[in-house]
């Protein structure tokens, strides 16, 4: 990453990806209350989508290689599928 993006763009990626984990932890603790559970999972999904946007920018601007981008994109999509499974099937998580 160039100097001007080293902290800005990487910080956005770091913060949005960590937010996915933090919101997932909160949602799981609130799983007894279906609306809270789904609400927090919706935040997870939004943060995961934001992470994907920053990864797309990183690739398009030439900061990461095609291989790294593809690997991270596939992982991001898998996380999104799992989050959406939880949103659509809350009863399977102790709700």
Identify the role of each PLM range.
Residues 1-95:
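Amphipathic alpha-helical assembly/interaction segments
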């Amino acid at each position: 990453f160039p100097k001007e993006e080293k902290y800005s763009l990487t910080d956005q990626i770091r913060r949005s990806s960590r937010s996915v984990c933090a919101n997932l932890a909160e949602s799981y603790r609130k799983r007894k209350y279906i609306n809270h559970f789904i609400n927090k999972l919706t935040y997870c999904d939004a943060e995961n989508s934001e992470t994907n946007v920053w990864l797309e920018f990183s690739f398009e601007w030439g900061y990461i290689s095609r291989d790294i981008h593809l690997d991270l994109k596939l992982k991001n999509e898998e996380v999104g599928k799992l989050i959406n499974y939880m949103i659509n099937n809350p009863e399977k998580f102790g709700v």
